[in-house]
């Protein structure tokens, strides 16, 4: 694909020029991305021998950060420089929900978005600050989000929404945009990954607005990461040290072997993703001995630096080709990631943060963790229960019967106690009563065609259950 002739890009330009659904900025951004891809600029393999482990100056241990000033006035000054931005482009489809993923209920009837707003409200109340919330939507989530944010109109949090770019999917066969083939619905388009956050902030006018209000840093995080809360120590450090970019990383466990890691490469700090690793080194990349940290996608970025780099068109992140199929037609989506931008910023660092700052909810198994007694909810913050002795969370595998939020919720009369659980694997048609306690290693398997009900108040410790006779 990368060897496609330039002539095809010229033809693509004229095809894209006639797409009335998108702006000139989007057309230009798309053509630039395709041109870079065609000239061979997809994620290149790194030279393995040049990789160096970053020092503590580059990846700073969280415990080594200076304490935050105690004077509330000083804290207010810090917060008045901050903007919180949540990536809100994803739908809840993998969890069986329609609409934006951020409106899935997490706990006590509160959604991801409710918790985010409550957290910032509490900060603003406590310090008299005015930290605003930005939501970067995609064309998939924009309309729903506009309606949803109306309920926060009386909040002390200013909420701004803007859209990330909308790019046409590329038909692989003849290098044409899918929408010009008569695919006029949403399937003809895609949002080009969260690397697009930087140009979209600028193109939407939000960047200049925030700079005019004296804002200096944006804290970017996925809306489904419940651990991504404002951290004053990190903000204070970045302002003191004038770091233009900070990526929060955290120690890798065996569950995170595919996550990107930070390396020192040719004198700069850089994100290394699995796609850039030569085949013979993939196992080494996945090991937790050599690469001990991974990217949480919690990012802190200086707004002036974003403006400078976007205006210079300098953010040329590695391109991630994402092949898809739409109605039998092979298409390509070209995407970029926000974490890969780290190498373009001055004085960029990582901060090695506690695992508590990485609590993503990607599936109902994650929802079970955060809805259980393993966590508590206070003031919008989901915090781990200190009564749990094991520092690691239990591993939870739920079968396809639990995949959708609706069916997951209906299968639990109440969420079991899992404070002392190490691992849980559930498969088949299993239903949980109220007040169930799970401890140690538990496997519950309903035989095909059999409904297995776990009775109220059952205590199951280190057991394999294959039928009612095992209870």
UniProtKB/Swiss-Prot annotation:
What function does this protein fulfil?
Plays a central role as a glucosyl donor in cellular metabolic pathways.
Q: Which residues form the signal peptide?
A: none
**Where mainly found?**
cytoplasm
Q: Which GO terms describe its biological process?
A: UDP-alpha-D-glucose metabolic process
**UniProt family annotation:** Belongs to the UDPGP type 1 family.
Q: Which InterPro entries match?
A: Nucleotide-diphossugar_trans, UDPGP_fam, UDPGP_trans
Q: Name one Pfam family in it.
A: UDPGP
Native species: Pyrus pyrifolia (Chinese pear)
Q: Which residues bind substrate?
A: 89-90, 194, 222-224
Keywords on record: Cytoplasm, Nucleotidyltransferase, Transferase
Enzyme Commission number(s) from the entry: 2.7.7.9
Q: What's the protein name?
A: UTP--glucose-1-phosphate uridylyltransferase
**Enzyme kind, highest EC tier:** transferase
Compartments where located: Cytoplasm
Q: Please list the GO terms describing molecular function.
A: UTP:glucose-1-phosphate uridylyltransferase activity
Gene3D superfamilies (alphabetical): Hexapeptide repeat proteins (2.160.10.10), Spore Coat Polysaccharide Biosynthesis Protein SpsA, Chain A (3.90.550.10)
* UniProt-annotated binding residues for UTP: 87-90, 101, 164, 193, 224, 362
Keyword Nucleotidyltransferase found: yes
Catalyses: alpha-D-glucose 1-phosphate + UTP + H(+) = UDP-alpha-D-glucose + diphosphate
Give a GO cellular-component term: cytoplasm
């Amino acid at each position: 694909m990368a060897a496609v002739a330039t002539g095809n890009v010229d033809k693509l330009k004229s095809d894209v020029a006639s797409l009335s659904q998108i702006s000139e900025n989007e057309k230009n951004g798309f053509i630039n991305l395709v041109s870079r891809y065609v000239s061979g600029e997809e994620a290149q393999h790194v030279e393995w021998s040049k990789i160096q482990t970053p020092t503590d100056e580059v990846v700073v241990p969280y415990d080594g950060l200076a304490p935050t000033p105690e004077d509330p006035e000083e804290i207010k000054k810090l917060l008045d420089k901050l903007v919180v931005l949540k990536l809100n482009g994803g739908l809840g489809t993998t969890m069986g929900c329609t609409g934006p993923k951020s409106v899935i209920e997490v706990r006590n009837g509160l959604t991801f978005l409710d918790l985010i707003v409550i957290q910032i409200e509490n900060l603003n109340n406590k310090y008299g600050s005015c930290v605003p919330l930005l939501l970067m939507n995609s064309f998939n989530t924009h309309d729903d989000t506009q309606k949803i944010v109306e309920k926060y109109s009386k909040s002390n949090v200013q909420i701004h929404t803007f859209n990330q770019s909308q790019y046409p999917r590329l038909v692989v066969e003849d290098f044409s945009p899918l929408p010009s083939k008569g695919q006029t619905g949403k399937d003809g388009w895609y949002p080009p990954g969260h690397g697009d956050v930087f140009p979209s902030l600028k193109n939407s006018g939000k960047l200049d607005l925030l700079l005019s209000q004296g804002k200096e840093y944006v804290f970017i995080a996925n809306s489904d990461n419940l651990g991504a809360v404002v951290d004053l120590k990190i903000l204070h450090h970045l302002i003191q040290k004038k770091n233009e970019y900070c990526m929060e990383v955290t120690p890798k466990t065996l569950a995170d072997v595919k996550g990107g890691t930070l390396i020192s490469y040719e004198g700069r700090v850089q994100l290394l993703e699995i796609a850039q690793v030569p085949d013979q080194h993939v196992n080494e990349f996945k090991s937790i001995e050599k690469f001990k940290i991974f990217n949480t996608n919690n990012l802190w970025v200086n707004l002036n630096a974003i403006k400078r780099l976007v205006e210079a068109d300098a953010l040329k992140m590695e391109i991630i080709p994402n092949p898809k199929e739409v109605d039998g037609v092979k298409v390509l989506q070209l995407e970029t990631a926000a974490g890969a931008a780290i190498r373009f910023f001055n004085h960029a660092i990582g901060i090695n943060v506690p695992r508590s700052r990485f609590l993503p909810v990607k599936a109902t198994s994650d929802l079970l963790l955060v809805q259980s007694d393993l966590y508590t909810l206070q003031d919008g913050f989901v915090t781990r229960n200190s009564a749990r002795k094991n520092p690691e969370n239990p591993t939870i595998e739920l079968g396809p019967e639990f995949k959708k939020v609706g069916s997951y919720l209906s299968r639990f009369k109440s969420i079991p106690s899992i404070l002392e659980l190490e691992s849980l694997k559930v498969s088949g048609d299993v239903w949980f009563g109220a007040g169930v306690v799970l401890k140690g290693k538990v496997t519950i398997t309903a035989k095909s065609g059999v409904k297995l009900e776990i009775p109220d108040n059952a205590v199951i410790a280190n057991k394999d259950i294959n039928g009612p006779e095992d209870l």
